[in-house]
Amino acid sequence: MFYAVQQSEHTETLVVGLFQKSQLTGKALEIDEMLEGHLTQLLKEGDVSAKPNQVSKVFPPSSAGMKRIYFVGLGREANYSFEQAKERFAHVFQAIHKDRKQETAVLLDTFISEDVPPADAAHALAESCLLASYEVQDYKHKSNEPDKQIEAVYVVTDEDTQEVQAGLRVGQAYGQGTNSARTLVNMPGNMLTATDLASYAEELAAKYDFECEILEKSEMEELGMGGILAVNQGSTEPPKMIVLKYQGKKEWEDVVGLVGKGITFDTGGYSIKTKSGIVGMKSDMGGAAAVLGAMETIGELRPEQNVLCVIPSTDNMISGGAMKPDDVIVSLSGKTIEILNTDAEGRLVLADGITYAKQHGASVLVDVATLTGGVVVALGTETTGAMTNDQSFYQQVADAAQECGEAIWQLPITEKDKKRVKSSQMADLSNSPGREGHAIMAGTFLGEFAESTPWVHLDIAGTATANKATCFGPAGATGVMARTLATLAERFTLEEDKNE
C-alpha cells in the first residue's frame, strides 16, 4: 500500500507540506516554479495556508501533469514534532479519503525536519493514513457501491528509500493494529461472543505464528478460576481464557505480560446498569481489543522480545444461576473475594488473568480494561488512568504512551487503599468496598494479584470510545493503548538488565 520511490508517475494527486516561512524553499519552491509562481501568489492571497493542519486543494493547469495538489500547513518548523507530523498527515489524508481518491503521491521531503527525520516522517504518514481513513463497519442494508478506500500511496523522496520504506512498514503495522482493535470494539455483542473472540485470536496466531491456547470452561474449573467462572454463571455463552505467546528470544525469559479484559457485553448482573448506562456495553472488551491490536503489530514487526497475551473473556448476564451480591468466590490465586457489586466484574476476570500470566512466566504485567466510571469522572475522555506497584516499570509504560501520543495519568495506591479492599469480614478481599475513589479501589484490588511482579494497570473506560469524530477517525472505538502496548513490547528492558 505504501511505496517509497525516488520519483513517481502516479501524480494525478499530490500532497505537499508547507512550513510557515518568509519564503518557499526546497521541494515546495520546486512546486512553485512548476506552477509558475502560482503557489506564492495563493499564499499571499490566503487561498493556501501554511498554518498548522490547514488543508488547501489546488487544481493546477494541465501543463503541470496532475489534476490536484493538496497543500497541508505544517506550522513553524521549530515547533514541528513527530506527533504533530502525524496530526498534519491525518488532516490531509482525511481530505483525500473524503474525496474518494484511491491513489496519491506524497512529497515526503516537505514533511522532514531536524526533529522529524525521514523514517519518522514515513512512520507518521503510514500510521495517520490508516487511522484517518478508517471507517466503522456497519450492518446497514446498502444498494450503493462499496466505499472507495486509499489503496496506494507513493512516497516520493530524495532520501534513502530503504530507510523510508522501513519507516512506512512500522507506521503501517501500528495503524493496522489500532484499526483492528477499533473494529473489534465496534462489533455488536451478539456478533462478538467470547467464542468469536477466541476464534479471532486463533486466526491471528495462525497468521503470525504465535503459540495459542484457548482454555475452555472445564479446564478453568479444574484450575480453579473462580473469578471468570463466577462472572460467567449467568450466561448461556461459554467463557474462554485466550492465551497467545510470541517468543522473539531464544529463551522464555524477560516476558512482557499483557492482560486484557474481555467482557463482550456487560449488563451489570444483578447490580444491573441503568437504561442509559447499559447502551454501549459491547465496548467492555476494549482492553482485550487493545491487547490483540498490539499483538498484531508485534506479529508484523517481530521484535526480539517475549510477549504473553492473556484475555479472560465472557459476558456478564443475568439468570437464575448468576452470581449474587454477598457471594464469596475463590480466585485462581487462592484468595477469596466477597461480591458486593456484580457490576464490578471486570476485576474478577482480570484477577484470574493476572494470576495465569504470572504462572506462565510474565516478568512484568500490564492489564488494560474499561474498568470504572470513576476514572472518567476523574480524568475525562482524553486521558487513561494508570496505577502501578513499580515506578521504574511505570516509566517505561509512560514513555511508550508519550511516544505514541496516548495520554496517561498516574493515580495513587496507598496503604489505606489496600486496607479498604481487604475490609471484608467474609473473605480476603472485597470486589467493591465503596464508591469513594472507585477507580483507585479497582486498581488496588488488581494489585493484590500482581503482588511483587512489576505491574501497571491502565483504565481505558473514558478513552476506549470517542463521541465525536477527530482527524484520526470517526466517532466510536479508538483502539486506545494498542500502540502503547506494542511500543512497550518493542522497547522493554528488565530493570536488572539495565544494571548489568
UniProtKB/Swiss-Prot annotation:
Its main location: cytoplasm. Its cofactor is Mn(2+). It catalyses: Release of an N-terminal amino acid, Xaa-|-Yaa-, in which Xaa is preferably Leu, but may be other amino acids including Pro although not Arg or Lys, and Yaa may be Pro. Amino acid amides and methyl esters are also readily hydrolyzed, but rates on arylamides are exceedingly low; Release of an N-terminal amino acid, preferentially leucine, but not glutamic or aspartic acids. InterPro entries: Leucine_aapep/pepB (IPR011356), Macro_dom-like (IPR043472), Peptidase_M17_C (IPR000819), Peptidase_M17_leu_NH2_pept (IPR023042), Peptidase_M17_N (IPR008283). Binds 2 manganese ions per subunit. Its EC number is 3.4.11.1, 3.4.11.10. PROSITE patterns: CYTOSOL_AP. Belongs to the peptidase M17 family. This is Probable cytosol aminopeptidase. It comes from Bacillus subtilis (strain 168).
